[in-house]
From Swiss-Prot:
This is Ribosomal RNA large subunit methyltransferase M. Pfam families: FtsJ, RlmM_FDX, RLMM_N. The lineage of its organism: Bacteria, Pseudomonadati, Pseudomonadota, Gammaproteobacteria, Alteromonadales. It catalyses: cytidine(2498) in 23S rRNA + S-adenosyl-L-methionine = 2'-O-methylcytidine(2498) in 23S rRNA + S-adenosyl-L-homocysteine + H(+). HAMAP family: 23SrRNA_methyltr_M (MF_01551). GO terms for biological process: methylation; rRNA processing. The gene is rlmM. The active site is at K307 (proton acceptor). Belongs to the class I-like SAM-binding methyltransferase superfamily. RNA methyltransferase RlmE family. RlmM subfamily. It is found in: Cytoplasm. NCBIfam families: PRK11760.1. It comes from Shewanella denitrificans (strain OS217 / ATCC BAA-1090 / DSM 15013). Monomer. S-adenosyl-L-methionine binds at S189, C222, P223, G224, G225, D241, D261, D278.
């Protein structure tokens, strides 16, 4: 297939397009982007007939900042006949030799206009699933190890059809995790950290590295949205902020409130596992703070937000992440770095930093 379909947040098409253009070029998969502002998706059209297949297989989705989900796609079906919408979509998959898939997702971009098609998509899934099973494109039973068929309706009668590989795909419909806001969470920002843990760590990794007894620091904690997520996972938290903290959080006995500036705070003990930070500040300044903590060896893993500028957002993030990498190498710090524009992020990205990952969890245990 020649087209790579990428879901993103509406308004971030340019960033998603710039990123896929750069990453595809690094992999020698030539092509060009097609996108429209606020459509919430980007098409990367490859010059080679199998270019999108290469990207769907070899370009890790979790290495992309602005794409929520991606799949190798056909050309746009721009006028699907009302009397038979199934036939052309099935034919496209057969022509591309897509068979024995384990799941079907009929989706739309994440815009109010496209979501008006959601009811139709749910109804259409039934006859489409039957049609795909009949010709062997879809297995009779769901199989989480097989490719996933995607049909994305971008308008009435207009759809892209294709596939993603189960080991390089978001497990979530449209790439959007469905998280519930806890009634006792101090603020909606709590969902950002909840989503971040799920985005950057598997369930098994969370059980090992987000467990009860670990020490954590939350810089810029007030009123406690991010602290809440650490507390509910059983951690002991130093909440750093000049503002007031949520009373219920303080009553848990797991939080110590330091009335201080997050940029000047130094932890009294250095057995911290998690450092989290969601401060409204210049992204370069937050990055420098994380670099300083890493060089001092004050934490093991960090999740922090970088607020984005109005222009050149992808370029700015790329420069900051590359600079962090250079500084860590200069200081002989082994690290892993991931960055994602999460669903619950707005004009910001969330970064996960893991320092000396080969050392494991033990040295930062509560002691």
């Amino acid at each position: 297939m020649k087209n790579l379909f990428l879901f993103c947040r509406a308004g971030y098409e340019k960033e998603c397009a710039a990123e896929i253009q750069q990453r595809a070029a690094e992999m020698n998969v030539g092509g060009f982007v097609k996108t429209t502002n606020n459509d919430a998706y980007v098409i990367y059209q490859c010059f080679e007939d199998d270019g999108a297949d290469t990207l769907a297989k070899m370009l890790p989705l979790n290495s992309l900042i602005f794409a929520r989900q991606m799949f190798a796609a056909s050309e746009l079906h721009s006028d699907l006949p009302e009397q038979d919408r199934v036939g052309p979509l099935v034919a496209s998959l057969l022509e591309a030799d897509v068979t024995k898939c384990g799941e079907l997702r009929v989706e739309t971009p994440d815009t109010n206009e496209a979501k008006e098609l959601s009811a139709f998509c749910r109804k259409f899934t039934v006859p489409l699933r039957q049609g795909l099973k009949k010709v062997g494109v879809l297995l009779d039973k769901e199989n989480g190890r097989r490719p996933i068929i995607h049909v994305c309706f971008v308008g009435p009668g207009k759809a892209y059809v294709g596939y993603s590989l189960s080991n390089n795909s978001s497990p979530h419909f449209m790439g959007i995790p469905r998280l519930r806001m806890a009634a006792d969470a101090p603020s909606r920002s709590s969902l950002k950290l909840d989503e971040a843990f799920g985005a950057f760590l598997t369930k098994e990794e969370q059980e090992m590295r987000c467990r009860s007894g670990l020490k954590a620091v939350d810089l810029g904690a007030c009123p406690g949205g991010w602290t809440y997520q650490l507390v509910r996972r059983g951690m002991m938290v130093a909440a750093v902020d000049n503002g007031p903290m949520d009373e219920k959080l303080m009553e848990t006995g797991q939080v110590k409130h330091y009335r201080a500036d997050g940029f000047r705070f130094e932890p009294p003990r250095k057995n911290i596992y998690w450092l989290v930070c969601d401060m409204v500040e210049k992204p370069s300044r937050v990055a420098e703070l994380m670099e300083a903590w890493a060089i001092n060896g004050w934490f093991k893993e960090a999740i922090f937000n970088l607020k984005l500028p109005m222009k050149s957002r992808y370029k700015e993030v790329r420069v900051i992440l590359d600079t962090m990498g250079e500084i860590f190498k200069e200081n002989e710090i082994d690290y892993r770095l991931q960055c994602k524009h999460l669903y619950h992020d707005r004009d910001e990205v969330t970064v996960h930093l893991w320092i000396f990952p080969e050392k494991g969890v033990s040295y930062a245990e509560m002691g």
